């Protein structure tokens, strides 16, 4: 019934967006590519590539979603991301030294990544 149709619509909505982007009917923001890339690297244990990409992914998320919603939670998450930028720059620079991953790096990546993912999910849900 209606519940089944609603669940199917919720499941396929991201696919519709992907199809529109591929078909040239819609444009994706850089953060929509970068944030999932960081997640894929982190989940696969590629901590250094994730650490190198996270700062620019978070910066893109802030810039590209700043004015997209008037929502207190959205603004609080963007403030959290913005305040994380100095630490993400340090992380990026440390990852560039070539010394490999360090203890706790995965958790350092996970926290701001989860906030950025939440920002993108919220924007997707509230702008449709």
How does the language model describe each region?
Residues 1-28:
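Helix-loop junctions and short alpha-helical segments
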Residues 31-34:
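Accessory, solvent-exposed terminal regions and/or long lumenal/extracellular loops of proteins
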Residues 38-39:
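Conserved small-residue packing positions in alpha-helical repeats and bundles
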Residues 42-43, 49:
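Hydrophobic/aromatic side-chain positions at a characteristic register within alpha-helices
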Residues 49-50, 57:
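Solenoid-repeat scaffolds in large eukaryotic assemblies
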Residues 60-61, 99:
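Alpha-helical junction/boundary sensor with strong preference for TPR arrays
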Residues 73-128:
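Long, charged low-complexity segments
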């Amino acid at each position: 019934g209606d519940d089944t149709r609603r669940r199917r619509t919720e499941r396929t909505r991201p696919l519709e967006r992907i199809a529109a982007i591929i078909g040239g009917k819609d444009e994706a923001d850089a953060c929509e590519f970068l944030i999932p890339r960081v997640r894929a690297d982190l989940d696969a244990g590629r901590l250094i590539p994730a650490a190198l990409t996270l700062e620019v992914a978070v910066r893109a998320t802030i810039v590209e979603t700043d004015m997209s919603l008037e929502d207190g939670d959205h603004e609080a998450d963007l403030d959290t991301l913005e305040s994380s930028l100095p630490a993400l720059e340090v992380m990026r620079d440390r990852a560039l030294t070539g010394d490999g991953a360090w203890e706790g790096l995965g958790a350092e990546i996970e926290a701001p990544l989860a906030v950025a993912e939440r920002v993108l999910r919220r924007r997707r849900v509230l702008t449709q």
